[in-house]
């Protein structure tokens, strides 16, 4: 069995992170994972709560009869002392959920910012000979979160970690994956090079914008994703479900929903993995076009971004199971079969 270290952070910072300035909506994921050779199912998310205890105005799937994924210890798996998880400042709530699923404590790490904006990272426990998993989406502010990830990787490499996996639930710059006109940069390839050169041995990402992004890395990439099963062309009188990898300003998906309503759709649902939610996304999504907007927590969702139609699902169990299988040298692809 390979050694693995999972770090999330007891974070010490000289300035508040973007997340600390507002309450983040969190909730338990409800998934079931079988053996490495059996498929996984994910059917439900538990009620959400805000970090300050207030009840957010976000509905959840309502069926208490659906299964809840048991902790690893209940399935005969004991935590491995060589597996460590660290979290950056971008999404510590998700990192904590992943650690809970794996039955681990987040690793101790110090992250702070100097007055000139430079980032300082120090691991506060040994990772020598360990499998280290660094959980840090490169969501907005993308440049700060990316640089923080690179410095975390470098710190682990210099501390003699055996393997370093960058767990990037949301991969920023993924849309810059090709040249659309002359003299443009392919930033997705550049970011892949930076992560590799910093010292990462592997990348774990959720629902990349395009499959070709995996080819930009010279190291193994585990791609966690969902898949469309069918498409119905005639929507008159039917329930329409719109799927996308991300919602940024929501302009495209709102126009699509308006078209579906004009074509006679009875209800329209929007589902996406990454909720970037740049203005005026919330205004468009809450305008009445959608019966429900279902997203995941690859990017932290702030309370001021909530609206009555919003449902947030957690990817913690899915990422946690993938992390364990990478560490255990088990099949990752069988999760999706």
Give a label for each model feature.
Residues 1-337:
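PRPP-associated nucleotide enzymes
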């Amino acid at each position: 069995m390979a050694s693995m270290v999972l770090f999330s952070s007891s974070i010490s910072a000289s300035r508040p992170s973007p997340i600390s300035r507002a309450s983040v909506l969190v909730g338990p994921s409800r998934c079931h994972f079988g053996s490495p050779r059996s498929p996984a199912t994910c059917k439900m998310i538990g009620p959400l709560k805000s970090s300050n205890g207030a009840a957010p105005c976000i509905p959840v799937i309502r069926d208490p009869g659906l299964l809840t994924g048991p902790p690893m210890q209940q399935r005969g798996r004991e935590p491995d002392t060589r597996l460590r998880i660290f979290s950056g400042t971008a999404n510590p709530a998700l990192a904590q959920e992943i650690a809970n699923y794996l039955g681990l404590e987040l690793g101790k790490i110090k992250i702070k910012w100097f007055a000139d904006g430079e980032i300082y990272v120090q691991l506060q426990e040994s990772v020598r000979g360990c499998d280290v998993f660094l959980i840090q989406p490169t969501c907005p502010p993308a440049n700060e979160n990316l640089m923080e990830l690179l410095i975390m990787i470098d710190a682990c490499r210099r501390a003699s970690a055996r393997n370093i996996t960058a767990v990037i639930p949301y991969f920023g710059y993924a849309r810059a994956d090709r040249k659309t006109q002359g003299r443009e940069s392919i930033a997705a390839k550049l970011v892949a090079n930076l992560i590799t050169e910093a010292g990462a041995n592997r990348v774990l990402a959720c629902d990349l914008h395009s499959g070709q992004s995996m080819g930009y890395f010279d190291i193994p990439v585990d791609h966690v994703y969902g898949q469309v099963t069918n498409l119905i062309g005639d929507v008159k009188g039917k329930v329409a479900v719109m799927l996308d990898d991300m919602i940024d300003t929501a302009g495209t998906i709102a126009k699509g929903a308006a078209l579906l309503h004009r074509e006679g759709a009875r209800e329209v649902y929007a589902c996406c993995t990454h909720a970037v939610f740049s203005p005026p996304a919330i205004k468009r999504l809450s305008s009445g076009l959608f019966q429900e907007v279902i997203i995941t927590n690859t990017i932290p969702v702030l309370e001021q971004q909530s609206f009555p139609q919003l449902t947030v699902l957690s990817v913690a169990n899915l990422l946690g199971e993938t992390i364990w299988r990478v560490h255990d040298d088990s099949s990752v692809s069988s999760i999706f079969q």
